[in-house]
């Protein structure tokens, strides 16, 4: 894995890795054990920061979101996570049962499968906005969440004389990249290009692109290489 030597180098130098994900808390907790990562983490597209058992919220509760969606149901055709069981979420996402259960364990957002026209979707998004919420179009889902984004929590984490480096490859990463001191666009697979200005850009995709750019930045800051052998 090209990422592991970079993570070891960061760990030895005291450079924390703070994950900022669209995933749920349950999903990230299942993943981070393999990395040995105990840093704060941001979930559900900037909706909350968890630091141990402490939580700082930037979005609104899923209960409030579902309540707001009730009044829109008669006018629009959509189906959300809250309307179905784990088997259907497995079909929608291609996830195995345990992973689908973690994906369903949401506190600050509701993914919708849109079943209406594009024109209706635009109208729906406007009405959601009027209710103090926002929509975020992902690959498969239209996500409804509070008025937050991946950039807002970065201000909460900001410390004096500390540079924030952010790396991402999708539209929902843009606010985070713009809020960071150093924003890095990781090349996306296929023909998709994230439109962003004054950003560093990788030549590789995915984890290789992440490792490429973090190595470049650590070299720039003269962070020493790890003495750990990943053999």
Locations of the language-model features?
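Short low-complexity, flexible loop/linker segments enriched in glycine and/or proline
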Residues: 32-36, 113-114, 151-152, 200-201
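Active-site phosphate-binding/coordination module
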Residues: 1-83
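Mg2+-dependent phosphoryl-transfer enzymes with acidic/Ser/Thr/Gly-rich catalytic loops
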Residues: 1, 139-231
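Short hydrophobic/aromatic-enriched beta-strand-loop microsegments
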Residues: 38-44, 98-100, 183-188
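Residue-level detector of anion-binding/catalytic polar loops
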Residues: 16, 134, 182-183
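Conserved acidic, metal-coordinating active-site core of Asp-based
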Residues: 72-165, 171-172, 179
């Amino acid at each position: 894995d090209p990422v592991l030597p970079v993570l070891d180098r960061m760990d030895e130098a005291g450079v924390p890795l703070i994950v900022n994900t669209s995933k749920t808390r349950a999903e990230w907790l299942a993943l981070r054990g393999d990395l040995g990562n105990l840093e704060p983490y941001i979930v559900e597209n900037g909706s909350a920061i968890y630091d141990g058992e402490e939580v700082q919220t930037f979005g609104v509760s899923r209960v409030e979101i579902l309540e707001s969606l009730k009044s829109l149901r008669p006018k629009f055709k959509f189906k959300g996570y809250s309307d179905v069981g784990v088997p259907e979420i497995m079909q929608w996402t291609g996830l195995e049962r345990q992973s689908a259960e973690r994906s369903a364990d949401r506190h600050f957002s509701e993914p919708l499968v849109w079943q209406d026209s594009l024109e209706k979707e635009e109208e729906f998004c406007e009405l959601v906005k009027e209710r103090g919420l926002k929509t975020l179009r992902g690959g498969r889902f239209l996500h409804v969440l509070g008025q937050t984004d991946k950039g807002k929590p970065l201000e909460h984490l900001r410390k004096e004389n500390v540079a924030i480096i952010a790396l991402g490859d999708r539209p929902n990463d843009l606010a985070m990249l713009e809020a960071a001191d150093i924003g890095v666009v990781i090349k996306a697979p296929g023909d998709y290009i994230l439109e962003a200005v004054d950003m560093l850009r990788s030549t590789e995709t995915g984890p290789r692109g992440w490792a490429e750019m973090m190595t470049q930045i650590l070299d720039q800051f003269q962070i020493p290489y790890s003495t750990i052998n990943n053999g």
